[in-house]
Amino acid sequence: MPRKKKPSIRFTIDAETWGLDARKLAFGVIQNVDTLEQYVFYTYDDAKKWLQEKRKEYLETNGITEKDARILVYGHNAWKYDYLGLFTIDEIKQADKIDAKGRILVGTIDGIEYRDYKTLVQVSLSQIGEALGFPKGITPMKFRIGDESQGITQEDIDYCIQDCRILTEAIKSLETTYKEWCNSPHDLELPLTTASMAYRVWSARYWPEHWFTINKQDKKVDIAFCHNMFNDALEESYVGGRVQVIGEPMKIYPNTISVDRNSMYPTEMRDQVFPDMMGATYCKPYMVNFRKLLRDPDICIWANLTLEGGKDSPPFLATKTEEGRRCWTRTEFTGWLCEPEIKHALELGYKVTELKELHYSQAIRPFKEFVEFFYKLRLEMRAKGDASQLWIKLLMSALYGRFGMKDIAVRIDNDEEIEKIIETGKLDQYHFNYYDGRRGSLPFLVAIEGNKKPSSTWFGFASFTTSYARVSLNKAILAAGDGAYYCDTDSIFFNADKLPDMLEEIEIGNELGQWDYEIEEPTNFIGYEPKAYLFITDDKEKVKIRHKGVSLTDETGKLVPQAGDLTKEQFSRNVIQYRTAMRRNLPLGSKHIQSKVSKRHYGKKSPLED
């Protein structure tokens, strides 16, 4: 549930560096969120010293103890950049921190919490600024290319101050909106992630009435639970969005357009039914039970089964190749599968050849009111020019993922904690290793058992949401027939001549669940591999490029010649992250250029050279 906000002092921080290197500080700005007091720093040590002075001043002025002090610093994408210059590897290693799969969400160093706002609002600072009416300026070229000869001007400092102001206003706006969403009489602590915020809002407003138990004190407690076997089975059925080159890779397809569905997941959450955690059960895996439950509109099922397609059955189910890659081209499936895809498969001529296990539960609609309320509210805000509508879009899209959180391995970096575990004879409960391998100077522990289990997990919601979405996407793909060339989660690229057929299945518009154009003017399309494609005109103008994991532009922002051509060597420009720095003995936050080539296409004849 939402947590009451404790007394705190908050700052935003932004640093400008000479080039893509977090260590090469030009200057930076720290801004008090509430008073807008600003401090310009030219060394990272000065920044940390100033923050400690403000912390001491805050404690003394308000009579707050060290234990109760809350000093928060927010940066945008800061644990991916700014903080990598502000701190050393050892400072981060010894910090009390929360991370998710290697991405640090918050780290407490010398009594100050350093947070990353981008884990809470996963859009760029320029998008936030535009929404809030505080437009972000363009990064001066001298900082992008690292030209120190031009020096630092007041205009540069004002640019950085504006970045802090955008973040400051974003924090205050989201705090106000979050409080209203939760119907809270008091101020609330902002969560660390978008999914956490969405879950807390849903819990505060739309928690299912029958989800409760009576504790030993004979008090009602809002809690839901089921046997682990049901959640584990649904976790096995949980698959993300379908991303596939449907046509022939590297082939040029002319006359191509693309459409994507507005708020795919929120739409399915509004329109569909989901399995009730509190009522999950199982029965004998007999086909008579399977058919009976499948026909019941008040029941949701999930089953461990084998499906085989008929002669004309199109492939659409998620399988894996022998190499472990996701595959969408097979008509035989074995494993756990949710009802939406089971029904769709049977409609397409698939047969159940083996039924191993059969689970089911009552069907409920836990998200209908949530989505309808916030979608309506967003439309009203948009009409009034209220910038807070940006937060609603993020909130609606993030909720389903919270229910699909997997166990998090308990990792211990802090040397004192490691020593304490060794001294108390508990080392056998952990895997002991070193980040730096044979050098053996950077130890860490990972718990053998006792992984952190998220309290909000119910894969029945997460797996059914994505299952419904994949069925909706496949229906659109089938409507496009042999004109479908590529798909990605909620979008499909297809021959424009197939649009009339598509409109029999989908509706074009701006409303929730309708589809809208990404590329409306027909042009040439090349799909290389998942998350890598190109739209290009007959005159060789690159209209849109998607290539995950590589840099499409150089330091000046100019498109590199090889962008969108996977037959050529590509490069990614980034900075060395915390764990990478330890593992590879590289300077934390330093610029890193990595060569990347496609295993499928590198060295082949380029389709752009015809």
Which role fits each region the language model picked out?
Residues P2-T12, L20-F27, Q31-D610:
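Conserved acidic
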